[in-house]
Amino acid sequence: MKNIKFGSLEDGRTAGLYILESAVGMRAAVTDYGAALVSLAVPDSKGVMRDVVLGYDDAHGYETGSGFIGASVGRFANRIAGAGFELNGQRYSLTANDGTNCLRSEEHTSELQSRI
């Protein structure tokens, strides 16, 4: 495993990129900013390595971009209708960030945090 600098965050901290490679050449790159999968290189049918993941070139892209690209950590997956739910008689309200629904997570939560 290699660890390289992946850029600086707006608050001045440095984000790292961890590159893991298998014995057969498959390569994954994950940043400690949101545990986002930055790239995944696998061989195509002719053995040529291809990156099959949409990712940004540096930490700044993940910090300022949209769409949860590469995000692997979040409070919940998919959409919570009505931006809220009830559990054991207790009503929990979430941020409506997709019309009247809450999509994937609220603003400034797990998927957008540095794991440094």
Q: Where would I find each of the regions flagged by the language model?
A:
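Beta-strand-rich N-terminal accessory domains
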Residues: I4-Y56, A81-A96
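Short, basic/aromatic beta-hairpin or loop at an interaction surface
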Residues: Y62-G70
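Short Gly/Pro-enriched turn/cap motifs at secondary-structure boundaries
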Residues: G7-E10, A71-A77
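Short, Lys/Arg- and Gly-enriched loop/turn segments at beta-strand edges
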Residues: T100-R104
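Single conserved hydrophobic/aromatic residue that forms the stacking wall/gate
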Residues: E107-I116
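Residue-level marker of intrinsically disordered, low-complexity segments enriched
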Residues: R50-V52, A71, N78, S114
